[in-house]
């Protein structure tokens, strides 16, 4: 009798061990199935955190504004400004006439229509017009393929860029890698930041950001003339970035 009881105890113990092993194995299987989801969620959270920090850093870039930019633009609110390489043109009749721009009512986006050319090369082309006297053309800013921003003309003066809107707009020329006219990611990001800061500075909304096409019907900037949805997304990105700059500035003041 005692042997039978002992046998039953051993059998019960084996069954309990098997059940525990079975539960452990099932739990491991569940965890293995969930692992990709957990990794994906962690990656998403990391990306969101990185994007938030990146937006905050962009909004705080004004701390590094150099003395040349200060001299070119004067005593203004630099908070949220991107890094700007100031290389002002010589005052001349063909690219920097030195005529006052009394009130900025809009931002005009252009493309260079010269694939692979650099911001520096386009700036130098404007500068050399004083000697070649080929035509009258220029821009306040030129953004390069790596996102570098070169300022050619103070925003207090007109540029020869946007025809009958020269007298009340700031112009931004953008370099591009190919004939499609689509900007690189770095060019795009700098364009959004610069435009958002200018909109904040001059109290403009996204509707005040226009294409050269909207002034003259010219195929400029080509990619945004041919892709209306991409243009509207760009203006939405500008509006969002402008709000980020304002929020960061208010947070800093509080």
Regions found by a protein language model. Name each.
Residues 3-162:
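N-terminal catalytic cores of peptidoglycan-degrading enzymes
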Residues 24, 28, 33-40, 48-82, ...:
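Basic/polar, cationic surfaces and motifs that engage anionic cell-wall
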Residues 99-101, 133-134, 160-164, 179-190, ...:
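Extracytoplasmic/periplasmic, Sec-exported soluble proteins
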Residues 108, 142, 171-173, 210:
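Soluble periplasmic/extracytoplasmic beta-strand elements of cell-envelope proteins
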Residues 112, 175-177:
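Short strand-loop junctions, especially beta-strand C-caps/beta-turns
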Residues 163-171:
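Short coil-to-beta-strand
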């Amino acid at each position: 009798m005692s042997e039978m009881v002992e046998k039953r105890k051993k059998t019960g113990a084996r069954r309990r061990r098997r059940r525990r092993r079975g539960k452990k194995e099932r739990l491991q299987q569940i965890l293995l199935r969930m692992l990709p989801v957990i990794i994906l969620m962690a990656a998403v959270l990391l990306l969101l955190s990185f994007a938030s920090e990146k937006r905050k850093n962009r909004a705080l870039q004004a701390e590094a504004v150099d003395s040349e930019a200060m001299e070119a633009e004067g005593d203004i609110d630099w908070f949220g400004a991107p890094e700007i390489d100031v290389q002002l043109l010589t005052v001349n009749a063909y690219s920097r006439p030195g005529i006052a721009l009394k009130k900025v009512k809009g931002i005009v986006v252009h493309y260079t229509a010269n694939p692979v050319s650099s911001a520096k090369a386009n700036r130098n082309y404007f500068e050399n017009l004083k000697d070649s006297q080929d035509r009258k053309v220029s821009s306040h800013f030129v953004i390069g393929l790596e996102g570098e921003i070169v300022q050619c003309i103070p925003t207090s003066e007109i540029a020869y860029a946007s025809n009958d809107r020269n007298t009340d707009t700031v112009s931004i020329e953008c370099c591009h890698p190919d004939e499609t006219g689509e900007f690189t990611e770095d060019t795009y990001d700098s364009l959004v930041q610069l435009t958002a800061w200018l909109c904040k500075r001059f109290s403009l909304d996204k509707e005040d950001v226009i294409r050269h096409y909207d002034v003259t019907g010219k195929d400029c900037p080509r990619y945004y003339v041919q892709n209306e949805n991409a243009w509207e997304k760009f203006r939405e990105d500008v509006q969002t970035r402008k709000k980020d700059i304002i929020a960061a500035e208010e947070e800093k003041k509080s």
